Amino acid sequence: MRPLAAETPRELLIEDTARLTPLFESEEFAVYLAPANAAPNVPREIGRLRELTFRAAGEGAGEPLDLDSFYPHYLHLFLWSKPGREVAGAYRLGPTPDLLPRFGAPGLYSSTLFHFRPEWFDRIGPTLELGRSLVRPEYQKQYAPLMLLWKGITRYVSDHPECAVLFGAVSISDDYNPVSRCLLVSFLETQKEAGLAGLVRPRRPYRRNHLTHRCELAVSGFLRDVEGLSAPIADLEGDGKGAPILIKQYMKAGGRVLGFNIDPRFSNVLDVLMMADLRRAPLPLLERCMGRDRAAAFLGRPARIHPAP
């Protein structure tokens, strides 16, 4: 494993953010969305923080930076800590209406993990690929960073409603107990989007093992949702972690599963390809993330009128 790259000089990051207009702000954070060339120093720092964060979670590629050939043509959503004057979190967004005409399916990061039959894109229509998420370790115990990043994603979708379907790979670290991983896979198998999953094939499939049958019985017997799954997983894990937070976020939005892949380049993480059609997401979730007026406009309905207290 190679040493982590040095931190990007703070003054360069401040210069980059000064050229951008935030999507929105809270007291502590500002949320920005920009192509790589609009803030040239930010992607490098995001790549450094991804490798730092992934290593801490038992993942990572062992390189100084987690930067790949997809960075130049993706959008970078990032969270800026105003008091800390540093990048606190990030997500990578790939709108397929922009990427597919220019690069075809190989221009999507997900295509390095899964084979997509051409009709998959015809069936699913315009989408927004999500991936490479991170929250800097110092901010991981706060609720706000991940929520603000999801608000940023839904803000983009509300401005580009043709990209109402989100999809991307969510990782389950090899640090999870084998029984925990087996329970997660067995539950997620019950959440497959049958019609579309048949059009996707993993490059390195997850293999059933001697635990699979027992896990399937456990899931069918008493585990009804991903929140219910978190408690037994937390009991199995030495650090008390439950189901991965991003899987829970997808499921709250009505997420469905498309397939599973093992990625040896990133410490054998298990990649779960997931999708969520925000047009079918619970209205309270959309209102919380987009705001009531934006959610109503996105869904093409009048805003709900709440009675005065």
Task: Report the location of each language-model feature.
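Short Asp/Glu-rich motifs
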Residues: 73, 269-270
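Short, conserved charged micro-motifs
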Residues: 41-42, 142, 282-286
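Short amphipathic alpha-helix that is part of the acyltransferase structural core
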Residues: 22-89, 95
